Amino acid sequence: MTANFIRALAVKSFDDPDRRRCPDKAEFDLVTVDDYSVARLILAPGWRWSVSAKPAELTNFCEHHHLGYCISGQLEVETADGGRSTIHAKDTYALPPGHDEWVVGEEPFVGVEFLGAASFGRPRSFGMHALI
């Protein structure tokens, strides 16, 4: 396990993110505090990774790790091996590489991600994450 250290006080708002990108039916707001990246995801009703992101990612499934907290909405996740779960408001979640995901219902999915967020702004990442 890696040791994590916070070196300085840092406070930032998603209302004034370091980066904001709005690919198909999504908004990603990224802030960096100290050396840590945190992202707010807003996924609109009808958003599905295999439809909205797969064409840019060029992989059969999302190959990123995600560790997050759902603020509102619902997100259905299905892994490549057939595992399936629904993320609801107030749930924490960990998603391994090799999954599809989609918004359930008519309410946007709003989440905050702590692992996986750094790839949202990385210029040499795979597809969708490189665009954010």
Annotate each predicted stretch with a short phrase.
Residues 59-77:
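Short, conserved beta-strand element in jelly-roll/cupin
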Residues 48-49, 73-78, 101:
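Short beta-strand segments in beta-sandwich/barrel cores
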